[in-house]
UniProtKB/Swiss-Prot annotation:
InterPro entries reported in the protein's UniProt record: Aminotrans_V_dom, Pser_aminoTfrase, PyrdxlP-dep_Trfase, PyrdxlP-dep_Trfase_major, PyrdxlP-dep_Trfase_small
Record's subcellular location: Cytoplasm
Subunit details: Homodimer.
Known EC number: 2.6.1.52
Organism this protein belongs to: Bordetella pertussis (strain Tohama I / ATCC BAA-589 / NCTC 13251)
Cross-referenced PANTHER family: PHOSPHOSERINE AMINOTRANSFERASE
Protein known as: Phosphoserine aminotransferase
Enzyme class: transferase
GO cellular component: cytoplasm
Length: 377
């Protein structure tokens, strides 16, 4: 068996090796049941135990109060861009929602919501600007909260708190009351930094995350919603996507992605065993500081994001000489550094350094960056 490479994929991303080993060991026989998790009925006692334990562990990791429902759904973050408005826009007589647009994913959220109601932009980073005397191109900065314009009668205010492609991150979420909209719940797409640092879930009405970045394999989406927001689905909302139904049946209203939920539950236990969300935050801060520190000190590479809003999870960077891009990627793969190519919409490179990426992987990347610069700089 070949050595495992360092996987910098933005998602689906690397899983903790200990989780993969446990899943492999239990593949044919889960806890003496004689069955693989993939063969279990989603309503049978074994899977009910797996699902309920995963929810309990997640609640413990996040300190969730009882008035928040936890749902394990399907469709990914992109699916939630439709499921959220179908569930929440019915809270108002005229379906409407506001959006803080800061990159690719919040742009798609805004566009999708427009199919179900009046989706307006409350703030945007779509234009170039200047911050502290530094020119910033579009999607590399975040609009100051005091510039947001939120309607008091909106069904919700949406933001993406970590833009996977652009590499910008909200470290704090505003209280809608401070924006003059106390009755407008905050909806946050936390997909690419879920469980990477403490998040003030209680400040939001609803958060969602595709698991395939920090929480597990592709196929399951975590939705956490304040219970008073359930039960307002638009008539066009499919029953399987109605949060009230999913919450009432403990994520088993229809057949859920059983194996993905099982592996996600193993990831929750791995996080608990490694210091919980605080432990993840400490490790992620160290990795990000190491990588950004090297990039900032190099004249060969450049990170385009405003320093104060850089993501700890997704680090885009460009080579000053873009004609070397192909050689860079080929050399990286030869060195066991995989999935470093940037998203097609922005080009360049991107290193996603999620929870499962150890400090040693980031150091291996930096060693390669140094060597490539030495040979081509």
């Amino acid at each position: 068996m070949m050595a495992r490479p360092w996987n910098f994929s933005a998602g689906p991303s690397a899983l903790p090796e200990a989780v993969l080993q446990q899943a492999a060991a239990e593949m044919l026989d889960w806890h003496g049941s004689g069955m693989s998790v993939m063969e279990m009925s989603h309503r049978g006692k074994h899977f009910v135990q797996i699902c309920d334990e995963a929810e309990a562990d997640l609640r413990e990791l996040l300190g969730l109060p009882a008035d928040y429902a936890v749902m394990f759904m399907q469709g990914g973050g992109l699916g939630e861009n439709a499921i959220v408005p179908m569930n929440l826009m019915g809270r108002r007589s005229t379906p409407a929602a506001d959006f803080v647009v800061t990159g690719h994913w919040s742009t798609r959220s805004h566009k999708e919501a427009g199919r179900y109601g009046d989706a307006q932009i409350a703030a945007s980073a779509a234009e170039a600007t200047e911050i502290d005397g530094q020119a910033q191109s579009s999607w590399t900065w975040l609009p100051p909260v005091d510039t947001w314009r939120v309607r008091k009668d909106s069904a919700y205010l949406h933001l993406c708190s970590n833009e996977t492609i652009g590499g910008v991150e909200f470290t704090e979420w505003p209280d809608p009351a401070s924006l003059g909209a106390p009755d407008v719940p905050l909806v946050v797409d936390v997909s690419s930094h879920f469980l990477s640092r403490p998040l003030d879930i209680a400040r939001a009405g609803l958060v969602f995350a595709g698991a395939q970045k920090n929480a597990g394999p592709a196929g399951v989406t975590v939705v956490i919603a304040r219970r008073d927001l359930l039960g307002h689905a638009l008539p066009i909302c499919p029953s399987a996507f109605d949060y009230a139904n999913v919450a009432a049946d403990h994520s088993r209203y229809n057949t859920p992605p059983t194996f993905a939920i099982y592996v996600m539950g193993l990831v929750f236990k791995w996080i608990k065993a490694h210091g919980g969300v605080r432990g993840m935050e400490e490790a992620n801060r160290a990795k990000a500081e190491l990588l950004y520190g090297y990039l900032d000190g190099s004249a060969f590479y450049r990170n385009p994001v405003q320093a104060s809003v850089r993501s700890r999870m997704n680090v885009p960077f460009v080579l000053r000489d873009e004609s070397l891009n192909d050689a860079f990627l080929q050399g990286a793969e030869a060195a066991g550094l995989m999935q470093l190519k940037g998203h097609k919409s922005v080009g360049g490179m991107r290193a996603s350094i999620y929870n499962a990426m150890p400090l040693a992987g980031v150091q291996a990347l930096i060693d390669y960056l140094k060597e490539f610069e030495r040979r081509h700089g």
